[in-house]
Amino acid sequence: MDKELAQLRTLLEQPTVERKNGKDFILGNIGSKKVVLQKCGIGKVNSAIGAVEMIDHYHPDLMVSSGCAGGADTSLNVTDVVVSTECCYHDAYCGSEQEYGQIMGMPARFASPQELVAKAAAMEGDIRVVPGLIVSGEWFVDSRDKMRSILDHFPEAKAVDMESCSIAQTCHIYGVPAYFHIESVGEQRVKLHAE
């Protein structure tokens, strides 16, 4: 995660660091856009806290999160990038009145703005960008059985992570108008595709 943050920091013009509540926020510009970076940590709680801190201190119009995910679709290759069209939880069950993965009182899925997804998918370069569903849960997918269990509920899932849906839910609750997640597919989990 430190490596990812360092790479993103190189994109900023004249970056500065602010420390708030024990967290470092890196501020700068990309062209005319003000950008704030932070490292949230692994898991739903860390990512939700990071999202709340970002919203509280900087009031973003757009929240973009990035990380490394396991590929849930056998057509994906290592280093392909999945851009969320929607996010949901793969480990939530609130009874038969809710969809599997839905938290009671929340949408079943948190949709990303279609225009941003289309822009990301249209980017040209050496890396393939694939739009699709990202599912989040509180455990590493380190076996074929775990991946099969996820795909039984979400056969259309493109990637699996531990943060994207909790950030999307936090943005939904706090009224952040736009959110989407960018995941680089990691080699370790790609090998765990359910066949």
Residue ranges and their predicted role:
Residues 161-177:
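Short glycine-rich, acidic/polar surface loops and turns
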Residues 72-154, 159:
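Mid-sequence, gly/pro-rich, charge-dense loop/helix-turn segments that line enzyme active sites
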Residues 1-52, 57-58:
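N-terminal short beta-loop-beta anion/metal-coordinating cradle
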Residues 88, 183-187:
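Short connector loops/turns at beta-strand edges and beta->alpha or beta->beta junctions
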Residues 188-195:
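His/Asp/Glu-rich mid-to-C-terminal helical/loop segments that flank catalytic regions of hydrolases
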Residues 26-37, 148-154, 186-188:
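Glycine/charged-rich beta-loop-alpha catalytic/anionic-binding loops adjacent to active sites
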Residues 59-64:
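Proline-aspartate-enriched helix->loop->beta-strand connector
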